[in-house]
Amino acid sequence: MAKLSLINREEKRARLVKKYAAKRAELKAVIANVQTSDEDRAAAYKALQELPRNASPVRQRNRCQLTGRPRGVFSKFGLARGKLREYAMRGEIPGIVKASW
């Protein structure tokens, strides 16, 4: 089980990403627009840089919803490989069966 502080940190990052998503998208659209003046583009760059660092979605880490494990997480299920196997063997995940050929 991951430390509770690390799990809370990830939740805080997720909240920040959600909070600033619209503003980030707006600034990135201004930057990407070829008709934007150089002054406006520079201002948009500066505003984008002044947003909180953790508001960027790249800083988020996929974690297991049960254990908080950061590695070996299947994003389709939101579970780490160990918990995924455990639940699949018990038949608690619909549509997952043990391979046999």
Swiss-Prot record:
GO biological process entries: translation
Gene Ontology cellular component terms for the protein in this record: cytoplasm; small ribosomal subunit
Chain ranges passing through the membrane: none
Keywords: Ribonucleoprotein, Ribosomal protein, RNA-binding, rRNA-binding
GO MF term list: rRNA binding; structural constituent of ribosome
Gene3D superfamilies named in the record: 1.10.287.1480
InterPro entries from the UniProt entry: Ribosomal_uS14, Ribosomal_uS14_bac/plastid
NCBIfam families in the cross-refs: PRK08881.1
Description of how the protein assembles with itself and partners: Part of the 30S ribosomal subunit. Contacts proteins S3 and S10.
Family: Belongs to the universal ribosomal protein uS14 family.
Protein's recorded name: Small ribosomal subunit protein uS14
Annotated source species: Thiobacillus denitrificans (strain ATCC 25259 / T1)
